[in-house]
Curated annotation (Swiss-Prot):
Oxidoreductase among keywords: no
C3H1-type zinc-finger residues: 9-37, 55-82
InterPro entries: Plant_ZF_CCCH, Znf_CCCH, Znf_CCCH_sf
Keywords assigned: DNA-binding, Metal-binding, Repeat, Zinc, Zinc-finger
Protein name: Zinc finger CCCH domain-containing protein 13
Classification via PANTHER family: PROTEIN PHOSPHATASE RELATED, ZINC FINGER CCCH DOMAIN-CONTAINING PROTEIN 67
Lineage start: Eukaryota, Viridiplantae, Streptophyta, Embryophyta, Tracheophyta
Lineage: superkingdom: Eukaryota
Molecular function as annotated in GO: DNA binding; mRNA binding; zinc ion binding
């Protein structure tokens, strides 16, 4: 199994999603820094086909429910049904 590689971009802001989850759905396309040897501070969650978090039991994201997009992206605390 090959290890997933995320871009290291010293001098750029760190990818907040990567720091929390240890994953980044943008992979090599992400413009932020992904430091090696990080320990995620939250458990990973499942993402829907748009890369938004599925959080069963949480309130549905009001922006996503209304417009089909989410301003907070993968860091949103609300559920994004499929």
């Amino acid at each position: 199994m090959s290890e997933e590689k995320f871009p290291e971009r010293p001098g750029e802001p760190e990818c907040s999603y990567y720091l929390r989850t240890g994953n980044c759905y943008l992979k090599q396309n992400c413009k932020y820094h992904h430091p090696k040897n990080i320990t995620p501070s939250e458990p990973q969650c499942t993402l829907n086909d748009k890369g938004l978090p599925l959080r069963p039991g949480q309130a549905i994201c009001p922006h996503y429910s209304r417009f089909g997009i989410c301003r907070s992206g993968p860091t949103c605390k609300f559920d994004h049904f499929t």
